[in-house]
Amino acid sequence: MSLNNVPAGKSLPDDLYVVIEIPANADPIKYEVDKESGAVFVDRFMSAPMFYPCNYGYVNHTLSLDGDPVDVLVPTPYPLMPGSVIRCRPVGVLKMTDESGEDAKVVAVPHSKLSKEYDHIQDVNDLPELLKAQITHFFERYKELESGKWVKVDGWEDVEAARKEILDSYQRAQNK
């Protein structure tokens, strides 16, 4: 089955399906799911010896301003396998700019049907401060050793901003 058949979610923007590309704490390898075949490709070996602080993936049938689907970070108690799909709800967004332009990262937690562990997290301010600091630190530095690449973290925004990011990106993809 192609991952293209996975819907964006059950009820956007609050009930998403996130396709995982990179597990939390995995080796510094950037994987990307090929949208046509559904295969997980090695995009590059990261120059900085850093680990993604959360599972990293995307929402199908969305189109961000950078031309890719919406990027999503998913904290979980265990790393998720690349190519797996997890049901989530958004809680915030890390606004960033890189060499290609605006590059927001939505943060979403597992749906309560998967785990009650995240039920108390309703907004980005409910996330542990250490986790937010780790995410910020990672994205400020993960491209530092790659020639011609850079990142500027613009800051955290709330659940409403995350919902808007998802809905705008979904609408953009539908109008494409």
UniProtKB/Swiss-Prot annotation:
Entry keywords, A to Z: Cytoplasm, Hydrolase, Magnesium, Metal-binding
Main location: cytoplasm
Cellular component terms (Gene Ontology): cytoplasm
Subcellular location: Cytoplasm
Residues noted as binding Mg(2+) 2 in the record, renumbered to the chain: D71
Positions bound to Mg(2+) 1: D66, D71, D103
Binding residues annotated for substrate, in chain numbering: K30, R44, Y56, Y142
Gene Ontology terms for molecular function: inorganic diphosphate phosphatase activity; magnesium ion binding
The organism's place on the tree of life at top rank: Bacteria
Pfam families for this protein: Pyrophosphatase
EC number: 3.6.1.1
Catalytic activity: diphosphate + H2O = 2 phosphate + H(+)
Record-linked HAMAP family: Inorganic_PPase (MF_00209)
Protein family per UniProt: Belongs to the PPase family.
Functional summary from the UniProt entry: Catalyzes the hydrolysis of inorganic pyrophosphate (PPi) forming two phosphate ions.
Protein name, entry field: Inorganic pyrophosphatase
Organism: Vibrio vulnificus (strain YJ016)
